[in-house]
Regions:
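ABC family nucleotide-binding domain
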Residues: 41-257, 261-264
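H-loop (His-switch) and adjacent beta-strand-loop-beta switch element
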Residues: 261-274
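ABC-family P-loop ATPase nucleotide-binding domain
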Residues: 1-55, 275-301
């Protein structure tokens, strides 16, 4: 499930490789020193993204809202990044822009090296279907369809010529097995618990093998225990399969277990917190390890 490759671009603005930052480097032994200069593929890059909402024509209120005000960051292939911030901080707008659901006022968004907002609406819709998987707080499953049909639906919608219906059937069942609910494949979502429905939603997000999975408060409708189980599944996907995940959450405890947290306030990045793991030096994690220490904080002025 890993995606992407290191791309060599001449233009610095389009540089989709990144060298491990020495400020965030873990100490390494002699046999690991080569990792310090390794380049790491970037799945997502935002460059000075702004989103401004102008007052509607005829509206009595003439307030201009800067929902996003110069947001720039990168997400590496296989990284699990959490977006944290108070209500109204711009988190939802940011996720909508990353997910190509809304165009920015200015700035660039690159997914797998492609400047997606240079595309027209038709091609942008195709990119959204092929490269992005969505997980919503409210699951957004279709109750008249079976669990398996829900998982397969994005593949059917995409109508990929390279993928047959039998391929989609097989992949859907494989994903349901990985997520521990293959035995529910023929049931309807309404017959499942909240945690099981969110597992179906995760499988659906992965069916087209996306470059990026966007999760909007995926544990928000679940109790603490079930929410942690769902989060652990997302963490497993990054650790075991190299899935790239960007998650919006209000849960600071869960955010602290992701690879990196980006705090946003008033449409700007306030700070980034790097939760150090083996992945920070280019080494795949052997298991889903809880990171108890926050070792590096980068304040963004």
């Amino acid at each position: 499930m890993s995606h992407g490759s290191t791309l060599d671009k001449k233009d610095p603005a389009n540089d989709f490789t990144m060298t491990t930052d020495s400020k965030h480097m873990l100490s390494v032994g002699p046999d690991e020193s080569h990792l310090q200069s390794a380049t790491i593929a970037v799945a997502l890059k935002l460059d000075n993204v702004k989103k401004i909402f102008e007052p509607r024509s005829g509206s009595a209120k003439k307030i201009v809202v800067k929902a996003l005000d110069g947001v720039s960051f990168e997400v590496r292939v296989g990284e699990f990044v959490s977006i944290v911030g108070p209500s109204g901080s711009g988190k939802s707008t940011l996720l909508n822009v990353i997910g190509a659901l809304d165009r920015p006022t200015s700035g660039k968004v690159f997914i797998k090296g492609q400047d997606i907002f240079l595309l027209d609406d038709t091609r942008l819709s195709d990119v959204r279907s092929r490269l992005i998987g969505f997980i919503f707080q409210s699951y957004n499953l279709i109750n008249r369809m079976s669990v398996q049909e829900n998982v397969e639906f994005p593949a059917v919608f995409l109508r990929r010529t390279s993928s047959s219906s039998s391929d989609s059937h097989t992949r859907a069942l494989e994903l349901l097995e990985i997520l521990g609910i293959k035995d529910k494949a023929k049931q309807k979502p309404v017959d499942l618990s909240g945690g099981e429905q969110q597992r179906v939603a995760i499988a659906r997000a992965l069916i087209n093998d996306p470059a990026l999975v966007l999760a909007d408060e995926p544990t928000g409708n679940l109790d603490t225990k079930t929410g942690r189980e769902v989060f652990d599944l997302l963490k497993m996907l990054t650790d075991r399969f190299g899935t790239t995940v960007v998650m919006v959450t209000h849960n600071l405890e869960l955010a602290g277990i992701t690879d990196r947290s980006i705090y946003i306030r008033d449409g700007r990045i306030e700070k980034e917190i790097l939760h150090k793991t083996k992945s920070d030096i280019g080494l795949p994690s052997a298991s889903a390890t809880t990171n108890k220490d926050i070792d590096s904080i980068r304040e963004v002025k």
